[in-house]
Amino acid sequence: MPAQDNSRFVIRDRNWHPKALTPDYKTSIARSPRQALVSIPQSISETTGPNFSHLGFGAHDHDLLLNFNNGGLPIGERIIVAGRVVDQYGKPVPNTLVEMWQANAGGRYRHKNDRYLAPLDPNFGGVGRCLTDSDGYYSFRTIKPGPYPWRNGPNDWRPAHIHFGISGPSIATKLITQLYFEGDPLIPMCPIVKSIANPEAVQQLIAKLDMNNANPMDCLAYRFDIVLRGQRKTHFENC
């Protein structure tokens, strides 16, 4: 397949992606398919998608320190999360919608079904969105999320993480994934992370400290690049 043909997608590497059924990750038992997957031919339905450049974005949609402000600033470690979205050939993906959602510094989501005992932060909503620029770059300012317990095992904890949704240029490039933070000791203990057999694929999910992008006296920064589709695409969230 010629590299310049961006209307079709290269075959994904099944060894790069986790198996759908990983019993240590309890939820996968009910969610994994029991029958062989069916390959669907690529058509215009898969190779095209919505254009989000016309959306009206608020001034603070990408700034989670300010977009749920109720008279104060949220509690926690202030950080910048930024990176570049590229396609299966390493080319930047401009003007694509990037959405993110996360727990607060105490490890609690602003969601009615989250019953973790950590308190909600009255000044933190935990959601943001932006469009990539002409070179595929995005940036958010937020609070570093806290870890939290989950009902997988007797004492399983999720590492600090941020969920990302990237639309890409077509329906087939839509990606839901998770960012983890460099140096977190909970990463190798997490059953979701351990479902990914390839250590390089795991490393692709770990944001690295980026002092060049930090704001002095304000925020540390972490770099998280995202690959849509292809042999080395960013891992699709298995939860």
Curated annotation (Swiss-Prot):
NCBIfam families in alphabetical order: protocat_beta
GO terms classed as biological process: 3,4-dihydroxybenzoate catabolic process; beta-ketoadipate pathway
Protein name per its UniProtKB record: Protocatechuate 3,4-dioxygenase beta chain
Reactions catalysed: 3,4-dihydroxybenzoate + O2 = 3-carboxy-cis,cis-muconate + 2 H(+)
Family indicated by similarity: Belongs to the intradiol ring-cleavage dioxygenase family.
Gene (name only): pcaH
The keyword Oxidoreductase appears for this protein: yes
Keyword Plastid: no
Lineage summary: Bacteria, Pseudomonadati, Pseudomonadota, Gammaproteobacteria, Pseudomonadales
GO molecular function terms attached to this record: ferric iron binding; protocatechuate 3,4-dioxygenase activity
